[in-house]
UniProtKB/Swiss-Prot annotation:
Species this protein is from: Shewanella amazonensis (strain ATCC BAA-1098 / SB2B)
GO biological process, one term: translation
Record-stated family: Belongs to the universal ribosomal protein uL14 family.
UniProt gene name: rplN
Assembly and interaction partners: Part of the 50S ribosomal subunit. Forms a cluster with proteins L3 and L19. In the 70S ribosome, L14 and L19 interact and together make contacts with the 16S rRNA in bridges B5 and B8.
Protein name: Large ribosomal subunit protein uL14
GO CC, one annotated term: cytosolic large ribosomal subunit
Amino acid sequence: MIQMQSTLDVACNSGARRVQCIKVLGGSHRRYAGIGDIIKVSVKEAIPRAKAKKGDVYNAVVVRTKKGVRRPDGSVIRFDRNAAVLLNNNLQPIGTRIFGPVTRELRTEQFMKIVSLAPEVL
């Protein structure tokens, strides 16, 4: 469950290391975002000479949460850290590599690129 002010790791090579959620997209009073939801983020920590600079604002898709996601068979997939992948205005990933596992819930038409770049799909 990601809400405003939540900090997330960045799971792509866009150059950002940590981001902070500044808005959960998808409704005027929407409070929480889960895996596969799009949020608006601000870059809080970045590596030098990278595409994403500190203070930049991007869209991002949540790929891992501590809260996890419940499957129809009753199992729950949880992670140690919250993580997101930065997106451009066309909702395509900015980076060319994805770090760490992603869940099968991202296998929608919109995020197939992220699933194909990920080293592991759970």
